[in-house]
């Protein structure tokens, strides 16, 4: 019985090292690029290998053997659908290792957002400084006129002293905001200048291109580079997971909340998919502190009060941090002081006239000192009211929009239920 002859074709693989496949092939064909023709009798166990045209992804490590001989296999487009963004490796022993650079590295760690946030904090520093200077400028005349006004015009020191206390409170609030803004600005700047940023940029650049993934044989050096990049990314996999948890905790701290269920953790992980990066434990700790300092909402509550209600809604009743409670209280305190201030200030002009009568003066002939100090105190009151209205208006507007939205949703839900009942 005649046996048909079969050929075995060996292709040149350039500088790509594919252990242990290349070792087995080169052991039989020492001259690369040579086509060796053998009979079936000489190699009864060898089957013909035909090259695949434009394979999608190369299976570098394959455990498919034919009598202790390993061959290079090709992963088709069906396999690529299983891992759209990465490469599939089958290591000896049948264990499939899947790494996807874009899955772990993400599209981009948004360093630009940090820079923009830092610029925003810088604008806050300027705005808070102006506010601090304004109230400090009012503090000086109020303090200077306090004692003469009390002696000449006011039998009870309520109005002038209360005006002074309000200014001191607003200065304290502006001072805290200014200090935290400066601290955050410096910490974020220090992080942006740290080696961690270079490490992030290097890893983000280690993503194989679509051309290399689509036709690896077209550029073997690029294929080898992409394999190396993938291995490097895989080494950082556990570090990325640890950092993801750290950044996720920072995000929860932003909203003054704590994650309390696995579903919420999954949602946070989805939001942070593109914000993972490699770093060692020291850099991760430094990054965590920098981001936490940056995202402390203390200065944002005073400058952008509409965030207060947003985060309250986002927490869904979860426990707020002590800092969030403190800032929320500081936002409410001026509103309460305004009410008391108006009540006290409205009766002050009568008290001034009564005091002038006791001094033997004409109640209709009010001294200039009394008029100037009284007007200054009312100016402080008006400015305090305007400042708090400006800061509280977005919160009230947001609350009204939320109520209106809830009413519409409830109405639509009821209408849908009525339609179902009619059907």
UniProtKB/Swiss-Prot annotation:
Comp. bias (Acidic residues): 67-84
Subcellular localization(s) per the UniProt record: Host membrane
Lineage: Viruses, Duplodnaviria, Heunggongvirae, Peploviricota, Herviviricetes
Membrane topology (UniProt): Multi-pass membrane protein
Cellular component terms (Gene Ontology): host cell membrane; membrane
The protein's name in its UniProt record: Putative transmembrane protein ORF103
Membrane-spanning intervals of the chain: 125-145, 162-182, 326-346, 366-386
Organism of this sequence: Ostreid herpesvirus 1 (isolate France)
Source organism, top-level taxon: Viruses
Residues covered by region (Disordered): 43-91, 253-282
Transmembrane listed as a keyword: yes
Keywords linked to the UniProt accession: Host membrane, Membrane, Transmembrane, Transmembrane helix
Keyword flag Aminoacyl-tRNA synthetase: no
Residue stretches of biased makeup (Basic and acidic residues): 43-57
């Amino acid at each position: 019985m005649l046996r048909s002859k079969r050929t075995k074709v060996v292709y040149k693989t350039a500088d790509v090292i594919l252990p242990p496949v290349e070792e087995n092939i080169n052991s039989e064909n020492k001259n690369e690029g040579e086509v060796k023709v053998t009979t079936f009798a000489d190699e009864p166990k060898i089957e013909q290998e035909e090259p695949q045209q434009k394979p999608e992804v190369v299976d570098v490590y394959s455990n498919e053997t034919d009598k202790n001989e390993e061959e290079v296999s090709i992963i088709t487009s069906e396999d690529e659908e299983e891992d759209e963004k990465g490469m599939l490796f089958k290591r000896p022993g049948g264990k499939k290792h899947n790494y996807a650079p874009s899955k772990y590295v993400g599209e981009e760690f948004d360093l630009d957002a940090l820079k923009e946030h830092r610029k925003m904090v810088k604008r806050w520093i300027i705005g808070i400084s102006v506010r601090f200077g304004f109230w400090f400028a009012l503090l000086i005349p109020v303090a200077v006129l306090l004692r003469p006004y009390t002696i000449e015009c006011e039998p009870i020191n309520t109005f002038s002293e209360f005006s002074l206390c309000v200014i001191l409170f607003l200065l304290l609030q502006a001072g805290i905001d200014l200090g935290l803004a400066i601290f955050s600005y410096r910490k974020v700047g220090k992080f942006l200048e740290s080696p961690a940023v270079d490490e992030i940029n290097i890893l983000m650049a280690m993503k194989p291109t679509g051309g290399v993934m689509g036709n690896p044989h077209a550029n073997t050096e690029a294929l080898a580079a992409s394999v190396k990049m993938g291995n490097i990314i895989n080494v950082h996999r556990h570090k990325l997971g640890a950092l993801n948890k750290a950044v996720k905790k920072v995000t929860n701290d932003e909203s003054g909340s704590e994650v309390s269920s696995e579903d919420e953790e999954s949602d946070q992980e989805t939001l942070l998919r593109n914000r993972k990066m490699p770093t060692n434990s020291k850099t991760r700790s430094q990054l965590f502190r920098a981001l936490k300092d940056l995202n402390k909402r203390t200065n944002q509550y005073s400058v952008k009060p509409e965030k207060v209600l947003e985060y309250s809604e986002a927490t869904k009743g979860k426990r707020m941090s002590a800092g969030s409670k403190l800032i929320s209280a500081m936002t409410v305190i001026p509103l309460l002081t305004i009410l008391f201030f108006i009540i006290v200030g409205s009766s002050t002009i009568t008290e001034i006239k009564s005091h002038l009568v006791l001094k033997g003066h004409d109640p209709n002939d009010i001294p200039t000192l009394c008029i100037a100090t009284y007007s200054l105190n009312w100016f402080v009151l008006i400015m305090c009211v305007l400042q708090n209205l400006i800061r509280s208006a977005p919160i009230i507007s947001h609350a009204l929009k939320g109520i209106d939205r809830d009413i519409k949703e409830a109405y639509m839900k009821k209408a849908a239920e009525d339609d179902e009942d009619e059907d």
